[in-house]
Every structure is written in structure tokens, then in C-alpha cells.
């Protein structure tokens, strides 16, 4: 699709087609990322100021520390968070792969075995919280 955008810019024509192509690309990327988060949404909200559900609101989670916000974290998770104060992509990969391996007794039951799917979720979480 990138070649089409460059072609339109160089030829200075078809700007309507260029804008339509960019709009479709943006919408499909957002829809794809939303789909990656769909399983997470049953237990987590991801809006700025959103309410906690079974799990905490994940807005801006990749830019904040672990065990932060107004969610009531378990003692085990809070102790683990002291040793792991920030969510890094690597830590989030491990968490999504098997949270119970990292924190025994955590409420989170979700496990994503596929690395590519975990990366999609992490990309989405990273995007959700970036100031525009």
C-alpha cells in the first residue's frame, strides 16, 4: 500500500484516492488491534478514567508502574510488583504467556501461547495511553 501513497504524492493526483486509502488503512489497523484486545476486554477496561472490572483498567499501562492505580491488587501481586516496578514489553510478554507462573494465585486466567498474538496485544496496550 505504501507504493500507492508514494505514487499519488509524486504524481500530485488522485488525492481523494490517497485519502481514502489512508483512511482504510487506519481503520483496518485499529480494528485489527481492537480484535487482539477483545479477549482482554471481558475483564479489563481500557479507557482513560475507565472503571476497573475483574481486572484493573489498562489505560496507559505500558507507561506506568505495575500495581498502580486504584485497583485492589493482591498481596502476592503487590510483592511481585515491588521487584518488577515497570511494565516492559518483555515482562508483559511473560505475563500474557503465563501470569500464574510469575505470580502464584493471581486471578488472571488468560494465557496467550502465540508470541505474535501477545505482541499484537502489547502493541495495542502501548498505543492506548499515548498522548495525542
Locations of regions flagged by a protein language model:
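C-terminal capping alpha-helices of c-type cytochrome domains
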Residues: 86-132
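Sequence/structural segment immediately N-terminal to covalent heme-attachment motifs in c-type
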Residues: 31-53, 58
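Sec-dependent N-terminal signal peptides
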Residues: 18-27
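Gly/Gly-Pro-rich "capping" loops immediately C-terminal to redox-active cysteine motifs
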Residues: 48-86
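Generic anion/oxyanion-binding catalytic loop in active/binding sites
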Residues: 22, 47, 81, 110
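Short, Lys/Arg-enriched N-terminal segments with co-localized hydrophobic residues
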Residues: 1-14
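A generic structural signal for secondary-structure junctions
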Residues: 23, 62-66, 97, 126
Amino acid at each position: 500500500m505504501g507504493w500507492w501513497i508514494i505514487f499519488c504524492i509524486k504524481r500530485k493526483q488522485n488525492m481523494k484516492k490517497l485519502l481514502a486509502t489512508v483512511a482504510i488503512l487506519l481503520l483496518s489497523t485499529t480494528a485489527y488491534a481492537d480484535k487482539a484486545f477483545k479477549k482482554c476486554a471481558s475483564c479489563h477496561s481500557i479507557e482513560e478514567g475507565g472503571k476497573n472490572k475483574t481486572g484493573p483498567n489498562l489505560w496507559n499501562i505500558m507507561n506506568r508502574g505495575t500495581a498502580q492505580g486504584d485497583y485492589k491488587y493482591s498481596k502476592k501481586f503487590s510483592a511481585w510488583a515491588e521487584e518488577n516496578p515497570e511494565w516492559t514489553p518483555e515482562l508483559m510478554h511473560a505475563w500474557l504467556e503465563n501470569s500464574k507462573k510469575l505470580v502464584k494465585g493471581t486471578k488472571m486466567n488468560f494465557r496467550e501461547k502465540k508470541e505474535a498474538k501477545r505482541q499484537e496485544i502489547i502493541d495495542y496496550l502501548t498505543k492506548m495511553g499515548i498522548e495525542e
